[in-house]
Each structure stands twice: as C-alpha cells, then as structure tokens.
Amino acid sequence: MYFPYLHGKQKEVLALRHLAPLLGSEARLQPVLEPVRQATTSVRHTLEACEAHRLQVWLVINPVRQDFELLAPAQSLEWGRQLFTSLPTRQWIHPTLMLGPALTPAVLRRFVQLF
C-alpha cells in the first residue's frame, strides 16, 4: 500500500481527480491530501470523484500550509470540518489530524468529538 502525501495544489488536485477511476479500481494507493487553499470548490470536486470511484483518501482536516499558516489551529480545524461535512457521502474519505507544535489539547479533543 502506498500513501503519497499531496499538498492539495491545483495540479495535484486535478491529477487526483482525473486518476480517481484508475486508482480506485486498483486499490493500491491511498493519498493523504492536505489542502493549501481556503477555496474549497476544486478540492470538494476531487473528493467527490474519489468517493464515486471508491478511492480511499486521507483528508487533513487541520491544514497548516500556505493559506492556513496564519490561522489558529481551531480555525483550520473548523474549515476542515465544514469541507468534510459538505460532501454528500463520506465512506471513502477519512478525516486526518495533522500533528505539530501548534496543536493544542483542545483542538485534539474537538477533532475526536467531531469525527
């Protein structure tokens, strides 16, 4: 099993969306996706394609790069919660918590409560 780490940049998101039918059918790859932009449309469409093709994706719910660098951990967690719950189905998308020095016990508890 291979777990490539994707930073959710536009080209990575589009590549994942277009490869979802092939990758889902082979079931040998489970990408970890950390969004880098607060705009959710492209990432949401990609996650919906992965869900439709049964491609397991590990979605970082509390991203920390680019658009999220200046957000408090609780704010990025809330952003991720909204993205995750906006998906019509979530059987193949798994919420994932990014561990790091800014992660507080309160954010960890909130993640456990939500997911």
Where are these regions (language model features)?
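Conserved, mostly hydrophobic/aromatic
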Residues: 31
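Short, solvent-exposed loop/turn at the beta-strand->alpha-helix junction
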Residues: 39-41, 103-104
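A broadly used, surface-exposed interaction patch
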Residues: 51-114
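N-terminal basic/disordered segments at the start of proteins
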Residues: 1-27, 37
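Histidine-anchored nucleotide/phosphate-binding helix
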Residues: 14-21, 41-54
